[in-house]
Amino acid sequence: MLDLYDAEVRIDNQSNSDVYQRHLGVLADAADVKVSREINGDYTLDFKYPSGTELFERIAVNCIVKCEGQLFRIMRISYESAQMAQISCLHVFNCDAKRFHVPNIGSTDTSDTIGVSPYSVINSAFEGTPFTVLSYEKVQQLGMKWVGATDGFLIDFESVDKTTPYDVMMQVIENCGRGEIYVNNTEIALVERLGT
């Protein structure tokens, strides 16, 4: 089942529940629903929807679609015919983490960026965004381990500015040479391996 929400969605991470501005309806007529996820890559939702329905008039780029408990942002609406539209969505992490700009990570004091944990770099990058970086304990409760949690693995991370949290996450993965992105709506972590 797919639910449609307006473009502004707030997540209440404290109570671990979704708080929506406005539910626009259930997309009961959705067809050919396909969710795809690449490790450390795009997490997408694609579906077809008849254009002659009342709810179709409310579907717009940037609206949120909830599928399988995950939130996806509509990125593109194209038409296969006059009666059928193809809707393409990106997970809110893949989309929204690229919209925020990190003013600066680190400083001229290299103790902020040399020999630091992947967690501390990622936590700094996502500070002030709607995303919550999960703690070591929370990730362990999910049956996974943060990169560097058990072996004390540290990285050197060059001070960067004018970047996005998403780009920082990708750079940390490259610097570590390992890790997989765990994402549950706006909760994120860099784990050794997804699953248990």
Q: Predicted segment positions?
A:
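Extracellular structured ligand-interaction cores
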Residues: T44, G69-L71, R178
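Catalytic micro-motifs at enzyme active sites that drive phosphoryl/nucleotidyl and oxygen chemistry
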Residues: K34, I74-S78, F157
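Juxtamembrane "anchor/assembly" segments of surface/extracellular structural proteins
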Residues: M1-R58, L90-D96, G106-V116
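Residues at beta-strand starts and edge strands
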Residues: G41-L45, Q83-A85, T186
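Short, solvent-exposed secondary-structure boundary motifs
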Residues: S17-A28, N62-E68, Y166-E174
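Charged- and aromatic-enriched interaction segments used to assemble
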Residues: M84, V92-T196
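Short beta-strand and beta-hairpin "edge-sheet" elements
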Residues: C63-L90, N94, Y182-N184
